[in-house]
Amino acid sequence: MKFFIDTADLEEISAANDLGVLDGVTTNPSLVAKIVSDPEKFTYQDFKDHIAKVCEIVDGPVSAEVTTLSPEEMISQGEELAAIHDNVVVKCPLTRDGLKAMRHLSGNGIRINATLVFSPSQAILAAKAGASYVSPFVGRLDDISTEGMALVDQIVRIYDNYRFPTEVLVASIRHPQHVVEAALMGADIATIPFDVIGQLLKHPLTDSGLKRFMDDASVIQQG
């Protein structure tokens, strides 16, 4: 299973990359907005420059989302984003127009991450349109009292049935259990917020066991 980090914060990306387990990055307009000190002065060129900086840190796929909704503009932006770096993956929303843009861009060799996917039928369309990745948003489904991980299970089984090459990239992860369940279901990738990556490391028995070992080690050293 591959681990991506879901953030646009360069410090978080660097810290996660230093752990040695990071395979890629996903960003979106909301994540970028969080790190911008003055949104009114933040231009589209600034956004592209920021994505380039992310690509300098991580040697792996970096998803950057289009910021428009018409198919022609999504295609134009997608081509601009893909030109930033070979590792850039263009995120397009799973809409009628988004699907058109995905088909065009993927047909021209640009990798696509189909985002905002909330149903198996949307995931099938993403695969048919040539998306390299499909991003089911499990946390947002949980928020409306729908079992988000059930969607992941359905997509994995459908893709296995037809041997679609599209990778299942589980998004909107809220806690470590989402990651574990995604792994058990055979999802290809989990894109994880920085704080949840830290939570993956934690277990109270590890902490208590380490304390005991260190206490015993101090006795040995004294002897």
Swiss-Prot record:
The reply to whether GTP-binding figures as a keyword in the UniProt entry is no
Q: Which GO terms describe its cellular component?
A: cytoplasm
Where in the cell does this protein reside?
Cytoplasm
Q: Which GO terms describe its biological process?
A: carbohydrate metabolic process; pentose-phosphate shunt
Q: Which reaction does it catalyse?
A: D-sedoheptulose 7-phosphate + D-glyceraldehyde 3-phosphate = D-erythrose 4-phosphate + beta-D-fructose 6-phosphate
Please indicate if the UniProt record lists Cytoplasm as a keyword. yes
Give the GO molecular function terms: aldehyde-lyase activity; transaldolase activity
What is the protein's major site of localization? cytoplasm
Keywords assigned by UniProt? Cytoplasm, Pentose shunt, Schiff base, Transferase
Give the enzyme class. transferase
Q: Which PROSITE patterns match?
A: TRANSALDOLASE_1 (PS01054)
Give the metabolic or biological pathway.
Carbohydrate degradation; pentose phosphate pathway; D-glyceraldehyde 3-phosphate and beta-D-fructose 6-phosphate from D-ribose 5-phosphate and D-xylulose 5-phosphate (non-oxidative stage): step 2/3
Q: Which Pfam families match?
A: TAL_FSA
Tell me the domain of life.
Bacteria
Known EC number: 2.2.1.2
| Stored NCBIfam families | fsa_talC_mipB (TIGR00875)
Instruction: Tell me which PANTHER family the record gives.
Output: FRUCTOSE-6-PHOSPHATE ALDOLASE 1-RELATED, TRANSALDOLASE
Its family remark reads: Belongs to the transaldolase family. Type 3B subfamily.
General function of this protein:
Transaldolase is important for the balance of metabolites in the pentose-phosphate pathway.
Q: Which HAMAP family match?
A: Transaldolase_3b
Q: What is this protein called?
A: Probable transaldolase
